[in-house]
Structures are given as C-alpha cells and as structure tokens.
Swiss-Prot record:
PROSITE patterns: RIBOSOMAL_L20. This is Large ribosomal subunit protein bL20. One of its GO terms (molecular function) is structural constituent of ribosome. Binds directly to 23S ribosomal RNA and is necessary for the in vitro assembly process of the 50S ribosomal subunit. It is not involved in the protein synthesizing functions of that subunit. The keyword Ribosomal protein applies. The gene is rplT. One of its GO terms (biological process) is ribosomal large subunit assembly. It comes from Neisseria meningitidis serogroup C / serotype 2a (strain ATCC 700532 / DSM 15464 / FAM18).
Amino acid sequence: MPRVKRGVTARARHQKIFALAKGYRGRRKNVYRVAKQAVMKAGQYAYRDRRQRKRQFRQLWIVRINAGARENGLSYSKFMNGLKRASIEIDRKVLADLAVFDKAAFAQLVEKAKSALAA
C-alpha cells in the first residue's frame, strides 16, 4: 500500500478556512490555527445571533407600538387588549410600521381599540 501524503487535502482544507476568514484583521486571516479558531467563534456568534435577532426585532416593534399608542392616550397592553377584543388581528411588525410611517391609520386603530375596551 503506497504512502499517502496529504499535501493536496491539507491545502484544500486550509484554503476553505482562509476563504471563510477573508476580511479578518491581523493573524486571524493568514495563520491557519488562529483563523480556524476565529471562524469557529464567528460561527457560534452567527448561530446565537440568528435567534437573538428574532427577539430583538419583537422588542423593537413593541417599543414602537407603545410609543404610538401612548401618543394617542393608551398604553401598549391596553391597546393590544383592545385590538384583541375588537377582533383585529394585525401582527406587531405591521402595527409598528403603521405607528412609524402611517400615524393616521394607527390612530384609527387606537380609536377602535378604545371603543372595544369601553364596550
């Protein structure tokens, strides 16, 4: 059985890591050991932050809805309760967009929520 020298496969493996580490600073971009660690850590951050992004956007939407609702004299929780009682099913992403870019439409929704709470 012939001896296997791994020059080709090792080079391919190294090139794959260096391609992923492209744009990094210092030795992280051109020293294999350091680049491999940096790529692994970047992957961990990416995995974690894909989940955090969903939470952070929901928080942002809630903050924007709360600000818009308070401009119209209602707290976030009462506004959402009023929408539920009025059988208005608009998700938070759209509500936040309305609160920022279409204040008149959002004000109408707040009025409907108020009337549903009063009834």
